[in-house]
Every structure is written in C-alpha cells, then in structure tokens.
UniProtKB/Swiss-Prot annotation:
Top-level taxonomy: Archaea, Methanobacteriati, Methanobacteriota, Stenosarchaea group, Methanomicrobia
Region described as CPSase: spans on this chain: 1-178
Keywords, ordered alphabetically: Amino-acid biosynthesis, Arginine biosynthesis, ATP-binding, Glutamine amidotransferase, Ligase, Nucleotide-binding, Pyrimidine biosynthesis
Positions that bind L-glutamine: 45, 230, 232, 258, 261, 299, 301-302
Protein name per its UniProtKB record: Carbamoyl phosphate synthase small chain
PROSITE patterns tied to this protein: GATASE_TYPE_1 (PS51273)
Subunit structure: Composed of two chains; the small (or glutamine) chain promotes the hydrolysis of glutamine to ammonia, which is used by the large (or ammonia) chain to synthesize carbamoyl phosphate. Tetramer of heterodimers (alpha,beta)4.
Pathway the protein acts in: Amino-acid biosynthesis; L-arginine biosynthesis; carbamoyl phosphate from bicarbonate: step 1/1; Pyrimidine metabolism; UMP biosynthesis via de novo pathway; (S)-dihydroorotate from bicarbonate: step 1/3
Family membership: Belongs to the CarA family.
Listed NCBIfam families: CPSaseIIsmall (TIGR01368), PRK12838.1 (NF009475)
Ranges for domain Glutamine amidotransferase type-1: 182-368
Enzyme Commission identifier(s): 6.3.5.5
Known catalytic reactions: hydrogencarbonate + L-glutamine + 2 ATP + H2O = carbamoyl phosphate + L-glutamate + 2 ADP + phosphate + 2 H(+)
Amino acid sequence: MKAVLGLEDGTVIRGTGFGAEGTACGELVFTTQFTGYEEALTDPSYKGQILMFTYPLIGNYGVSGERFQSDNIHAEGLVVREACKKPYHYKSTRSIHQFLEDEGKPGIEGVDTRMLTIGARERGTMRAALITGSDDGEEAVKVARNFPQITDEELIARVTCKEPHFIPGAECAWKGSGKPKHAVVVDLGIKRNIINNLHKRGIDLTLVPATTKPKEIAGFEPDLLFISNGPGDPEKATDAINAVKAFAGTIPVAGICFGHQIISLAMGARTYKLKFGHRGGNQPVKDLIENKIFISSQNHGYAVDADSLEGTGLYVKYLNANDKTVEGVSHKDLDIFSVQFHPEAQAGPMDTEETFFGKVVKVLGGDL
C-alpha cells in the first residue's frame, strides 16, 4: 500500500503504508523508546499527535493488550523505519499491522526516521499529515498546513472520563492507621498504570471528568487531590487549574506530567512549549535535594518556567540533566508536589516509582 508523510515545511517522505487506509493529522513527535509501543500508542497523552519511533524495528514482540494504558490507540498515526510483520512472543495475539488496522489508524514504514528526528531537533515540532493509499506529497503538505495547531484544540475533552466513578483501593494494602484514604483524581487522560500504582497502595480513588468544579470535588470529601497526565496545552485545563487553587493548603495535592504543569500554573508559575519535547525511557533526571541521578520515562511537549517559580512557594526538586528543564517541584510549606516525568513508567525504568508514590502514601498518613 502506498503512503506519504507531508510536513508543514514542505518536506515529503514516501513509504509503505500499513494498518488502516486513511489520513492522520497532528503534530509529528518522536520517542527514543526501544520497546513499549503498546503503552505509547494507547497513552492518551499522544492524542492529536503522530508518533514516530527512532528505534529502527518496532512490533517484534507483537501485541498482547496486557500493557495497554487505555482501551484504544490515541496516537493519530505511526511512523517507523520497519514494522515487524512476523512478531514472536508467547503472549502476542496480533501484529502491530493488525493492531493499527483494528483501531482504524494508519502507519507508514520504510521511512528514514533518524533524518526526520534530526529535522525535528533542529527546526522544532511541526504539523504533519500521514496518508495511506496515496503518495500525493503535495496534498499531504496541504493537509498538514491546514490542520490546526495542537494548542488550538480542546484535546482533553476527547480523553477524559465522562462521569465520576469509584475504584476501591486494593484490599488490605493500606498500611496507615484507620480506614484507607480517599483521593479524587482529575482525569485529563490518565494512564492505566498511574491508577494501578495508587490502587495497589490501598488508596480509594474517585476519577472525575476534567471539567469537574471544586464544589463537586469537595462533595466527594477527598483526602488528596491528584491531577493526572494528559494531552495538549496545560493552560487549556482551566477547571483543573481552578481545582488546585481551591484545595491547595487544605488537603495534599499531587500530580504527574500534565498534572505537574497544571499545579505549577495554579500556584502562579508559567509554562512554555519545548522545541521538540521529551519522549522516551532514557531521560536522566537529577534530584537536587538528594544529589542523585536517575533515569526516567517521559512524554511531554511543555515545561514549567523555572524563573517563574519565584514567589509561588514552589521550589525545583528535580532537574533534567540534559537540558536543565524543570522535572519536578515541591512546596516549601504545603503538601503540594509534582513530577514532570512518569514514575509509574509503562514503558520505561521504574527508578522513581516508590519515591513518588511512597510520598503520596506518606502525606496521607500511611506507612511506607
């Protein structure tokens, strides 16, 4: 099947199509992850983006569904050097070709992904159109240029839950005194493994839609407000920002990735868009308090402006060892903390899982 990838700067790349026949539009972003394509494709944070892997062979262990981070593929399309046609793993039920076809998502292979990655690093993230069943480069570029920027879309509405629902904590897992604590999780496109990490520590969870007002959240009587990961521009998540403002100082507040940016905005800081983002499982992060380096899994295109933290009560706890961007903050006086990286991994290293989720348990009065 013919396929073409067109970028807004006029770049045209032809290759071989796989998955579904059709057109995908979005920002072209790259990840340096070697494995974890099941997790990445089903991560709601990739909504509105065409995902490209720098690693040359993707799909070699097939698709099992055990590691999905949501029920469906959220990336708009997939760009790879080679998509494995005959995967092997004892749990695999289908190939990545079949997976994309089943989900109605197009893919393109036979592409020089390293060249495209270098271009993204030099020129920044660009809009793109991936068309399968055609090799009309002029049309692909036209579609890419006419597609609205990701910051103009309300992507959160497409991935948040539609109504509140309760998830009891794992039985007998709570190590603190008294009954298990209750966290309200503002779902902006939450990954399944974040839920799993809170659940297995015995914390009762109520997931609420992104548009839930502070008064409604208060009705659930939470012991903790948790802000999830999600897609797009954090400044668009106004209801979540207002929720943090309402509960900061009254109960503990924590967040991951998109949630980290929202917490920082709510406290008075600023965010900005990175040139090409951080995506992959090999991002080095420094803990400025413990003076330690660890490797983290990341997926974000925005960051918190370190200079804007002055006067907010927040301080930088974690810093990216590559480009010195903010990777996590804590409040000087309140139980408010967040990280830009993904301590729950899936996929990626789990160096910081216990550090982050252990702190969640601790601020709720539990035992580590």
